[in-house]
Protein backbone atom coordinates (compact mmCIF):
# COMPACT_ATOMS: atom_id res chain seq x y z
CA UNK A 1 0.00 0.00 0.00
CA UNK A 2 1.21 3.51 -0.81
CA UNK A 3 0.83 5.29 2.53
CA UNK A 4 0.33 8.90 3.53
CA UNK A 5 3.43 10.76 4.67
CA UNK A 6 4.35 13.35 7.25
CA UNK A 7 7.59 14.61 8.81
CA UNK A 8 9.64 12.47 11.16
CA UNK A 9 10.90 15.36 13.31
CA UNK A 10 10.17 19.04 13.95
CA UNK A 11 12.40 21.35 11.90
CA UNK A 12 12.90 25.10 12.13
CA UNK A 13 14.63 27.84 10.15
CA UNK A 14 14.67 31.62 9.86
CA UNK A 15 14.69 33.87 6.84
CA UNK A 16 13.43 37.18 5.52
CA UNK A 17 9.92 37.94 4.32
CA UNK A 18 9.86 39.04 0.68
CA UNK A 19 7.13 41.59 1.25
CA UNK A 20 7.84 42.88 4.78
CA UNK A 21 11.63 42.57 4.74
CA UNK A 22 11.43 41.36 8.35
CA UNK A 23 12.82 38.23 9.98
CA UNK A 24 10.49 35.21 9.81
CA UNK A 25 10.78 32.00 11.82
CA UNK A 26 9.37 28.93 10.07
CA UNK A 27 8.61 25.74 12.00
CA UNK A 28 7.33 22.52 10.43
CA UNK A 29 5.75 19.83 12.61
CA UNK A 30 4.53 16.27 11.98
CA UNK A 31 0.77 15.82 11.60
CA UNK A 32 -1.59 12.86 11.79
CA UNK A 33 -3.15 10.96 8.89
CA UNK A 34 -5.82 12.92 6.99
CA UNK A 35 -4.94 16.20 8.73
CA UNK A 36 -3.74 17.67 5.44
CA UNK A 37 -1.42 20.64 4.99
CA UNK A 38 -2.07 23.26 7.67
CA UNK A 39 -0.48 26.71 7.76
CA UNK A 40 -0.51 28.65 11.04
CA UNK A 41 0.09 32.32 11.82
CA UNK A 42 1.52 32.00 15.33
CA UNK A 43 2.24 35.73 15.53
CA UNK A 44 -1.49 36.29 16.05
CA UNK A 45 -3.52 35.76 19.22
CA UNK A 46 -5.42 33.53 18.88
CA UNK A 47 -3.36 31.57 16.36
CA UNK A 48 -4.97 31.55 12.89
CA UNK A 49 -4.99 28.36 10.80
CA UNK A 50 -5.20 28.09 7.02
CA UNK A 51 -5.93 24.80 5.29
CA UNK A 52 -4.34 24.33 1.89
CA UNK A 53 -7.30 24.65 -0.44
CA UNK A 54 -7.65 26.31 -3.88
CA UNK A 55 -10.70 28.28 -2.71
CA UNK A 56 -8.54 29.94 -0.04
CA UNK A 57 -6.22 31.39 -2.70
CA UNK A 58 -7.59 34.92 -3.08
CA UNK A 59 -4.48 36.91 -3.97
CA UNK A 60 -2.00 35.96 -6.68
CA UNK A 61 -0.54 39.39 -7.43
CA UNK A 62 3.11 38.72 -6.56
CA UNK A 63 2.84 35.24 -5.04
CA UNK A 64 0.30 32.65 -3.95
CA UNK A 65 -1.54 33.89 -0.87
CA UNK A 66 -4.11 32.14 1.34
CA UNK A 67 -6.75 34.49 2.76
CA UNK A 68 -9.44 33.57 5.30
CA UNK A 69 -12.94 34.98 5.82
CA UNK A 70 -11.56 37.71 8.11
CA UNK A 71 -9.10 38.84 5.42
CA UNK A 72 -6.14 37.49 7.38
CA UNK A 73 -3.53 36.15 5.01
CA UNK A 74 -0.38 34.11 4.67
CA UNK A 75 1.73 34.78 1.59
CA UNK A 76 4.50 33.23 -0.52
CA UNK A 77 3.63 29.59 0.14
CA UNK A 78 4.35 28.25 -3.36
CA UNK A 79 8.06 27.37 -3.03
CA UNK A 80 7.55 25.46 0.22
CA UNK A 81 4.46 23.81 -1.25
CA UNK A 82 6.46 22.58 -4.24
CA UNK A 83 9.02 20.96 -1.91
CA UNK A 84 6.20 19.22 -0.02
CA UNK A 85 4.84 17.98 -3.35
CA UNK A 86 8.25 16.58 -4.29
CA UNK A 87 8.30 14.27 -1.28
CA UNK A 88 4.56 13.60 -1.33
CA UNK A 89 3.99 15.08 2.14
CA UNK A 90 0.26 14.73 2.78
CA UNK A 91 0.12 15.96 6.37
CA UNK A 92 2.17 18.72 8.00
CA UNK A 93 1.75 21.73 10.28
CA UNK A 94 3.62 24.82 9.07
CA UNK A 95 4.01 27.70 11.52
CA UNK A 96 5.26 31.21 10.77
CA UNK A 97 5.50 34.23 13.07
CA UNK A 98 4.77 36.66 10.24
CA UNK A 99 2.27 37.21 7.40
CA UNK A 100 4.44 35.20 4.99
CA UNK A 101 6.71 32.22 4.52
CA UNK A 102 10.36 33.35 4.31
CA UNK A 103 11.62 33.75 0.75
CA UNK A 104 15.02 32.14 1.58
CA UNK A 105 17.12 32.17 -1.63
CA UNK A 106 14.06 32.44 -3.91
CA UNK A 107 14.01 28.73 -4.74
CA UNK A 108 12.71 25.53 -3.11
CA UNK A 109 16.18 24.21 -2.28
CA UNK A 110 16.31 25.44 1.37
CA UNK A 111 12.96 23.75 2.03
CA UNK A 112 14.21 20.52 0.45
CA UNK A 113 17.17 20.68 2.86
CA UNK A 114 14.79 21.11 5.81
CA UNK A 115 12.68 18.13 4.75
CA UNK A 116 15.75 15.96 4.31
CA UNK A 117 16.88 16.95 7.82
CA UNK A 118 13.48 16.09 9.25
CA UNK A 119 13.10 12.79 7.48
CA UNK A 120 9.86 11.39 6.13
CA UNK A 121 7.50 9.18 8.15
CA UNK A 122 4.83 6.93 6.69
CA UNK A 123 1.40 6.90 8.32
CA UNK A 124 -0.98 3.97 8.51
CA UNK A 125 -3.46 5.32 5.98
CA UNK A 126 -3.66 5.04 2.18
CA UNK A 127 -2.33 7.98 0.18
CA UNK A 128 -4.93 9.54 -2.13
CA UNK A 129 -3.87 10.78 -5.55
CA UNK A 130 -5.90 13.10 -7.75
CA UNK A 131 -6.09 11.33 -11.12
CA UNK A 132 -7.17 13.15 -14.30
CA UNK A 133 -9.81 11.39 -16.43
CA UNK A 134 -10.48 14.24 -18.88
CA UNK A 135 -8.56 17.23 -20.23
CA UNK A 136 -9.36 20.58 -18.60
CA UNK A 137 -7.95 23.81 -20.04
CA UNK A 138 -8.15 27.45 -18.97
CA UNK A 139 -7.04 30.44 -21.00
CA UNK A 140 -6.67 34.19 -20.69
CA UNK A 141 -5.63 36.07 -23.82
CA UNK A 142 -2.64 34.12 -25.19
CA UNK A 143 -1.85 32.49 -21.83
CA UNK A 144 -3.15 29.00 -21.11
CA UNK A 145 -2.76 25.99 -18.84
CA UNK A 146 -4.22 22.50 -18.93
CA UNK A 147 -4.27 19.18 -17.12
CA UNK A 148 -4.92 15.95 -19.02
CA UNK A 149 -4.80 12.18 -18.35
CA UNK A 150 -1.32 10.65 -18.07
CA UNK A 151 0.17 7.65 -16.30
CA UNK A 152 2.45 9.64 -14.02
CA UNK A 153 2.94 13.36 -13.53
CA UNK A 154 4.38 15.11 -16.57
CA UNK A 155 5.04 18.84 -16.85
CA UNK A 156 5.71 20.90 -19.99
CA UNK A 157 6.02 24.67 -19.64
CA UNK A 158 6.85 27.48 -22.06
CA UNK A 159 7.47 31.17 -21.40
CA UNK A 160 7.82 34.05 -23.84
CA UNK A 161 10.08 36.79 -22.49
CA UNK A 162 11.67 39.29 -24.86
CA UNK A 163 14.91 39.98 -23.03
CA UNK A 164 18.57 39.64 -24.05
CA UNK A 165 19.32 37.44 -21.02
CA UNK A 166 16.52 34.98 -21.79
CA UNK A 167 17.41 33.21 -25.01
CA UNK A 168 14.69 31.79 -27.22
CA UNK A 169 16.01 28.23 -26.95
CA UNK A 170 15.81 28.33 -23.13
CA UNK A 171 12.13 29.21 -22.82
CA UNK A 172 10.61 25.71 -22.82
CA UNK A 173 11.16 22.84 -20.42
CA UNK A 174 9.55 19.50 -19.67
CA UNK A 175 10.10 16.48 -17.47
CA UNK A 176 8.48 13.54 -15.70
CA UNK A 177 8.07 14.36 -12.04
CA UNK A 178 9.63 12.49 -9.12
CA UNK A 179 11.39 13.52 -5.92
CA UNK A 180 14.77 12.98 -7.51
CA UNK A 181 14.07 14.85 -10.75
CA UNK A 182 12.53 17.75 -8.82
CA UNK A 183 15.56 18.09 -6.55
CA UNK A 184 18.12 17.82 -9.34
CA UNK A 185 16.35 19.77 -12.08
CA UNK A 186 14.00 22.29 -10.47
CA UNK A 187 14.51 22.88 -6.76
CA UNK A 188 17.42 25.36 -7.14
CA UNK A 189 15.70 27.54 -9.78
CA UNK A 190 15.09 31.01 -8.32
CA UNK A 191 12.35 33.56 -8.74
CA UNK A 192 13.26 36.55 -10.90
CA UNK A 193 12.42 40.18 -11.49
CA UNK A 194 13.58 43.51 -12.87
CA UNK A 195 15.58 45.98 -10.79
CA UNK A 196 13.28 48.85 -11.85
CA UNK A 197 10.19 46.93 -10.67
CA UNK A 198 11.80 46.03 -7.34
CA UNK A 199 12.83 49.64 -6.74
CA UNK A 200 9.33 50.87 -7.62
CA UNK A 201 7.63 48.36 -5.32
CA UNK A 202 10.00 49.20 -2.48
CA UNK A 203 9.21 52.89 -2.91
CA UNK A 204 5.58 51.92 -2.24
CA UNK A 205 6.49 49.89 0.85
CA UNK A 206 6.25 46.55 -0.96
CA UNK A 207 8.79 43.81 -1.72
CA UNK A 208 10.99 45.15 1.09
CA UNK A 209 12.87 41.85 1.33
CA UNK A 210 13.68 41.74 -2.38
CA UNK A 211 17.42 41.55 -3.06
CA UNK A 212 20.13 39.76 -5.02
CA UNK A 213 20.16 37.14 -2.24
CA UNK A 214 16.66 35.89 -2.99
CA UNK A 215 16.09 36.38 -6.73
CA UNK A 216 17.56 36.66 -10.18
CA UNK A 217 17.62 40.42 -10.77
CA UNK A 218 17.84 41.92 -14.27
CA UNK A 219 18.07 45.32 -15.86
CA UNK A 220 17.02 45.87 -19.48
CA UNK A 221 20.06 44.05 -20.82
CA UNK A 222 21.52 41.47 -18.48
CA UNK A 223 21.40 39.47 -15.26
CA UNK A 224 22.87 41.60 -12.47
CA UNK A 225 23.67 38.83 -9.97
CA UNK A 226 27.43 38.36 -9.67
CA UNK A 227 27.13 34.56 -9.81
CA UNK A 228 24.85 34.61 -12.85
CA UNK A 229 22.34 31.83 -13.48
CA UNK A 230 22.22 28.40 -11.88
CA UNK A 231 20.77 26.94 -15.09
CA UNK A 232 20.78 28.38 -18.59
CA UNK A 233 16.99 28.00 -18.57
CA UNK A 234 16.49 28.90 -14.90
CA UNK A 235 13.58 31.22 -15.70
CA UNK A 236 11.25 28.59 -17.16
CA UNK A 237 12.37 26.04 -14.57
CA UNK A 238 11.29 28.40 -11.81
CA UNK A 239 7.90 28.96 -13.44
CA UNK A 240 7.45 25.19 -13.45
CA UNK A 241 8.49 25.03 -9.78
CA UNK A 242 5.82 27.64 -9.01
CA UNK A 243 3.20 25.62 -10.90
CA UNK A 244 3.97 22.47 -8.91
CA UNK A 245 3.48 24.39 -5.67
CA UNK A 246 0.30 26.03 -6.92
CA UNK A 247 -1.22 22.70 -7.99
CA UNK A 248 -0.35 21.05 -4.67
CA UNK A 249 -2.70 23.50 -2.95
CA UNK A 250 -5.31 20.76 -3.48
CA UNK A 251 -3.39 18.66 -0.93
CA UNK A 252 -2.89 15.68 -3.23
CA UNK A 253 -0.24 14.66 -5.72
CA UNK A 254 -1.63 14.66 -9.24
CA UNK A 255 -1.61 11.82 -11.74
CA UNK A 256 -1.85 13.62 -15.06
CA UNK A 257 0.01 15.87 -17.48
CA UNK A 258 0.32 19.63 -16.92
CA UNK A 259 1.03 21.84 -19.93
CA UNK A 260 1.21 25.62 -19.91
CA UNK A 261 2.18 28.68 -21.92
CA UNK A 262 2.96 31.90 -20.00
CA UNK A 263 0.93 30.70 -17.03
CA UNK A 264 1.33 32.21 -13.58
CA UNK A 265 -0.11 31.86 -10.08
CA UNK A 266 -3.57 33.15 -11.04
CA UNK A 267 -4.02 30.87 -14.05
CA UNK A 268 -2.57 27.87 -12.21
CA UNK A 269 -5.13 28.35 -9.45
CA UNK A 270 -7.93 28.91 -11.99
CA UNK A 271 -7.01 25.61 -13.64
CA UNK A 272 -7.04 23.72 -10.34
CA UNK A 273 -10.46 25.14 -9.46
CA UNK A 274 -11.80 24.27 -12.93
CA UNK A 275 -10.64 20.66 -12.53
CA UNK A 276 -12.17 20.25 -9.08
CA UNK A 277 -15.46 21.81 -10.18
CA UNK A 278 -15.76 19.29 -13.04
CA UNK A 279 -16.24 16.11 -11.03
CA UNK A 280 -16.34 13.86 -14.09
CA UNK A 281 -12.81 15.00 -15.04
CA UNK A 282 -10.99 13.43 -12.09
CA UNK A 283 -11.12 10.87 -9.33
CA UNK A 284 -9.26 10.03 -6.14
CA UNK A 285 -7.26 6.81 -6.37
CA UNK A 286 -5.24 4.79 -3.89
CA UNK A 287 -2.73 2.02 -4.49
CA UNK A 288 -3.28 -0.94 -2.20
CA UNK A 289 -1.13 -3.50 -3.97
CA UNK A 290 0.41 -2.05 -7.13
CA UNK A 291 3.01 0.71 -7.23
CA UNK A 292 1.98 4.27 -7.94
CA UNK A 293 3.18 5.65 -11.29
CA UNK A 294 5.13 8.42 -9.53
CA UNK A 295 8.02 8.02 -7.09
CA UNK A 296 7.83 10.12 -3.92
CA UNK A 297 10.68 10.25 -1.47
CA UNK A 298 12.00 6.73 -2.07
CA UNK A 299 15.76 6.41 -1.51
CA UNK A 300 16.09 10.05 -0.52
CA UNK A 301 19.84 9.64 -0.18
CA UNK A 302 19.94 9.12 -3.96
CA UNK A 303 18.38 12.49 -4.68
CA UNK A 304 21.76 14.24 -4.79
CA UNK A 305 23.54 11.56 -6.78
CA UNK A 306 23.92 12.25 -10.49
Swiss-Prot record:
Could you tell me which NCBIfam families the record lists for this protein? lpxC (TIGR00325)
Which catalysed reactions does the entry list for this protein? a UDP-3-O-[(3R)-3-hydroxyacyl]-N-acetyl-alpha-D-glucosamine + H2O = a UDP-3-O-[(3R)-3-hydroxyacyl]-alpha-D-glucosamine + acetate
| CC annotations in GO | membrane
Q: Where is the active site?
A: 265 (proton donor)
Q: What is its EC number?
A: 3.5.1.108
User: What is the official name of this protein in its record?
Assistant: UDP-3-O-acyl-N-acetylglucosamine deacetylase
Report the pathway entry.
Glycolipid biosynthesis; lipid IV(A) biosynthesis; lipid IV(A) from (3R)-3-hydroxytetradecanoyl-[acyl-carrier-protein] and UDP-N-acetyl-alpha-D-glucosamine: step 2/6
Quick one: which residues bind Zn(2+)?
Answer: 79, 238, 242
State its role: Catalyzes the hydrolysis of UDP-3-O-myristoyl-N-acetylglucosamine to form UDP-3-O-myristoylglucosamine and acetate, the committed step in lipid A biosynthesis.
Which Gene Ontology molecular-function terms are recorded?
Answer: metal ion binding; UDP-3-O-acyl-N-acetylglucosamine deacetylase activity
Q: Which gene encodes it?
A: lpxC
What does the sequence similarity comment in the record state about its family?
Belongs to the LpxC family.
BP terms from Gene Ontology: lipid A biosynthetic process
Its domain of life reads: Bacteria
Origin species = Hamiltonella defensa subsp. Acyrthosiphon pisum (strain 5AT)
Sorted alphabetically, which SUPFAM superfamilies does this protein's record hold? Ribosomal protein S5 domain 2-like
Class in the EC hierarchy, top level:
hydrolase
Q: Which UniProt keywords apply?
A: Hydrolase, Lipid A biosynthesis, Lipid biosynthesis, Lipid metabolism, Metal-binding, Zinc
Q: What cofactor requirement does the entry state?
A: Zn(2+)
